[in-house]
A protein has these predicted regions:
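Hydrophobic beta-strand positions in extracellular immunoglobulin-like domains
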Residues: 3, 115-117
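Hydrophobic residues positioned within well-ordered beta-strands of beta-sheet architectures
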Residues: 111-113
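A short core secondary-structure module
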Residues: 11-35
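An extended, acidic, His-containing surface patch that forms the Zn2+-binding/catalytic region
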Residues: 35, 39-103, 107-108, 119, ...
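Flexible glycine/proline-enriched surface loops and loop-helix/loop-strand junctions
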Residues: 2-9
């Protein structure tokens, strides 16, 4: 999101100011909410989360899972950082850069707005929505080559195979599908029309999770459990040897 101005000397301030315009534009972005969305995976995820969550949020999760048209429930979920991304696309400012000298009126100001796009919503659709929100205050451009895709269907054969594999290493563990506000190589496969699912046989405690750290590692038991998990999962999906 960027703004531009002729600039000038700070001793001669004017009403039009690139930084002020950007601030006003970001205030509008902050207030904007994408339309509520859902799919089979998120409804199953929120139903189970609601059963395990108490209070107002737990009630909202259960209500939304039962009726995703429940606007009041969606509003409560939107206030939860942990779950808002399971009900809609989110956009948030993450970086700012503006001005070129401490004693000069800014000629430009730029903000990076990071969007996590809900499967089924198009990248250009989000850009146009943000441009409509900021109006003439700023210009909204895409950075990089972002992609979007439709969600993969919640296939019963995949759920059955994953459940079997999980219970092979952790008997009695409930298996609940979920959607995360991130991305993986699965995005490329889904965009090509190939149903894709992220699964893992790695179980660990919170204090054993060093993901993306310099000391990223698995416990020894998790390594061997994962080998068994993948063997069961792949052989189930591939079928018997012929």
């Amino acid at each position: 999101v960027s703004t531009h101005n002729a600039g000038g000397h700070s001793s001669q301030p004017r009403d039009d100011n690139a930084i002020y315009d950007l601030a006003a534009a970001l205030t509008r972005v902050r207030a904007w909410q994408a339309p509520v969305m859902w799919n089979d995976t998120t409804l199953a995820q929120l139903k189970k989360a609601g059963e395990l969550t108490s209070g107002e949020l737990g009630a909202a999760l259960r209500k939304f899972a039962a009726d995703p048209h429940d606007a009041a429930a969606a509003a409560v979920i939107a206030r939860s950082p942990a779950y808002v991304g399971t009900t809609r696309t989110t956009c948030v400012a993450t970086m700012l850069n503006g001005g070129h000298a401490q004693n000069a009126l800014p000629q430009s100001a730029v903000a990076n707005v990071n969007c996590r796009i809900f499967p089924g919503m198009k990248v250009e659709e989000v850009r146009q929505a943000l441009q409509g929100v900021v109006g003439n205050l700023a210009e909204v451009k895409l950075t990089g080559t972002p992609m979007s895709s439709d969600p993969s269907p919640l296939r019963p054969d995949v759920v059955k195979a994953v459940t079997h594999a999980v219970n092979a290493i952790r008997p009695g563990t409930p298996v609940v599908p979920g959607q995360v506000s991130g991305a993986s190589d699965g995005l490329l496969f889904r965009s090509a029309g190939i149903p894709t699912y992220g699964v893992d046989g790695n179980f660990m405690k919170d204090d054993e999770d060093f993901s993306h750290g310099l000391n990223e590692r698995l416990t020894v038991q998790s390594f061997y459990d994962s080998l068994k998990f993948w063997h069961v999962l792949v052989t189930d999906l591939a079928g018997p040897r012929r």
